[in-house]
Amino acid sequence: MSYNGIGLQSVRGSATSGHIQKNIANKISKPGHYESRKNQKSLMSKRADEAKQSQNKREAYKQIKSELTKHEQLRRIEVKCMDLQDELEEQGVEPDEIKARVDELRKKLNNKEFDENDAKSPTTTTPQPSRKDKQLKEDLENENKNKDGVFEYKRRYADKRN
């Protein structure tokens, strides 16, 4: 029962099975172990930096998106104001009155957009459960009722056997 000259010649009389185990208690680390650990740490720090950069990109994207939506809202308001101005000019209304009406419309639309944005803010709205969520909840309740019926059957069956 020896392996490469290591171990017992014969297991007879030794009260052992002769199984040979590797001694890893005094194992010497491979050359370059420290460098590989150092490389792992640098790799982890690079990944953390990449995660921060991607988070920054997402935040920048959100900011740009909000700026674009705000610009789009302002553009729609100005288009409506220009339509009113063209219509009033065709009717032959005085320029001072045109300017006053257009300014009034612009203020009205800005206030309306501001009120809509307040209504859309996530702090004031509470999420409502969707139809799918309600359906899932009902399905789970029905499934639980069916399981209760199975257990009841098992109880009745067990009572009859005794």
UniProtKB/Swiss-Prot annotation:
Residues 46-69, 109-119, 130-162 have a biased composition (Basic and acidic residues). Residues 48-150 form a coiled coil. The keyword Nucleus applies. The keyword Coiled coil applies. Its main location: cytoplasm. GO terms for biological process: mRNA processing; RNA splicing. Pfam families: cwf21 (PF08312). It comes from the Eukaryota. Residues 11-26, 120-129 have a biased composition (Polar residues). Disulfide bonds: none annotated. It is found in: Cytoplasm; Nucleus. Involved in pre-mRNA splicing. May function at or prior to the first catalytic step of splicing at the catalytic center of the spliceosome. May do so by stabilizing the catalytic center or the position of the RNA substrate. Belongs to the CWC21 family. This is Pre-mRNA-splicing factor CWC21. It comes from Candida albicans (strain SC5314 / ATCC MYA-2876).
